[in-house]
From Swiss-Prot:
This is Endo-type membrane-bound lytic murein transglycosylase A. It comes from Enterobacter sp. (strain 638). A lipid is attached at residue 16 (N-palmitoyl cysteine). Keywords: Cell outer membrane, Cell wall biogenesis/degradation, Lipoprotein, Lyase, Membrane, Palmitate, Signal. A lipid is attached at residue 16 (S-diacylglycerol cysteine).
């Protein structure tokens, strides 16, 4: 009986430990940031064209692909900024007035990938997230929306977009991150914010 109780206790502790590690496991941004920095000239060009910080673009590249332009994920996210052709890619195409969606080969092209990823960030900022006043909160909202969708983020505040933006504007960046950690349906969302910020700090 004691042996069974000890085994149960060890499993319980292991579960608690793994949950804690998942929330904030070690991640060294040095190598992925160094690899992502090689694409900075393209990021600067795209950032200037779309009004997006090149440092944010580079940080997303570091976190998403580690600077590998040919990376394809299990969910078919492609390239440096890990764009899905059927979602972000299609949205950028629609915004530009083009038909269809980008091909895999197009998304593996560093310049095209960064251009479309940056365009998508701009579309989010000046579209569904428009109205967020604090620049730091906006940046965090962009990061979460980029990886998990803007709709999922806004619904954690309200089903009404205007009310959601108003609630966000009542928060500072720390309160926003805390809200995301407690309410976002994707458990990786707060960690993604942390990793992008860590990558930016490493530049």
């Amino acid at each position: 009986m004691k042996l069974r109780w000890f085994a149960f206790l060890m499993v319980l502790l292991a579960g608690c430990s793994s949950k804690k590690d998942y929330q904030n496991p070690p991640w060294n941004p040095e190598v992925p940031v160094k690899r992502a920095m090689q694409w900075m000239p393209i990021s600067e060009k795209a950032g200037k064209a779309w009004g997006v910080s090149p440092r944010l673009i580079t940080a997303i590249i570091a976190v998403e692909s580690g600077g590998n332009p040919t990376l394809v994920s299990k969910s078919n996210a492609v390239g440096l900024m890990q764009l899905k052709a059927s979602t972000a890619g299609r949205e950028v195409y629609r915004y530009m007035g083009w038909k269809g969606q980008p091909s895999t080969s197009e998304l593996k092209n560093p310049e095209r990938n960064i251009s479309m990823g940056t365009a998508y960030l701009s579309i989010l900022e000046h579209g569904v997230l428009k109205g967020i006043d604090d620049p730091e909160v906006m940046q965090y909202a962009l990061v979460v929306s980029y990886v998990n969708g803007a709709g999922a983020l806004l619904r954690t505040f309200s089903s009404d977009r205007k009310e959601a933006i108003e609630e966000i504007n009542g928060m500072d960046k720390n309160e926003f991150v805390d809200h995301v950690a407690k309410n976002h349906p994707a458990p990786q969302a707060p960690r993604y914010i942390w990793k992008v910020q860590k990558a930016m700090d490493a530049m």
